[in-house]
């Protein structure tokens, strides 16, 4: 009788991927990266185990936003003090902190659990073309579409 394969920490092989965000649309890039972080691009995907790979995103400052999202899309955060709500538009966030724009988008597509937090820690975003992970020998990843 065959049994369904269940991955565990001992039989997971993790790779490092480098993705160039220049000219890419925010949502399309984010959904594909979230899929890689979860491990859904592998045949050994197991929902309750972190089977995902490490992802390095470079040129985050050159990401594209379609339509009027730069002025209309608003990101909120709260300090947990009365009147402590802060808001910033996607355009301001892209100019001031493009890494956070991508991280927020991608981590919002991961599960809201301890497993999702663990998967989110395998994401590294850099605004420029340089990254300090050359020792891991990352492979270039070609996005679909």
UniProtKB/Swiss-Prot annotation:
Gene Ontology BP terms: negative regulation of translation; translation
Claim: Ribonucleoprotein is one of the keywords in the record: yes
Gene Ontology CC terms, in alphabetical order: cytosolic large ribosomal subunit
Keyword Ribonucleoprotein: yes
Coiled coil ranges: none
Gene3D superfamilies: Ribosomal protein L13
Membrane-spanning parts: none
Keywords: Ribonucleoprotein, Ribosomal protein
GO MF entry, a single one: mRNA binding
InterPro entries linked to this entry: Ribosomal_uL13, Ribosomal_uL13_bac-type, Ribosomal_uL13_CS, Ribosomal_uL13_sf
Family matches, as PROSITE patterns: RIBOSOMAL_L13
Source organism, top-level taxon: Bacteria
Entries under NCBIfam families matching the protein: rplM_bact (TIGR01066)
Family, similarity comment: Belongs to the universal ribosomal protein uL13 family.
Function: This protein is one of the early assembly proteins of the 50S ribosomal subunit, although it is not seen to bind rRNA by itself. It is important during the early stages of 50S assembly.
Self-association and partners: Part of the 50S ribosomal subunit.
Name of the protein in question: Large ribosomal subunit protein uL13
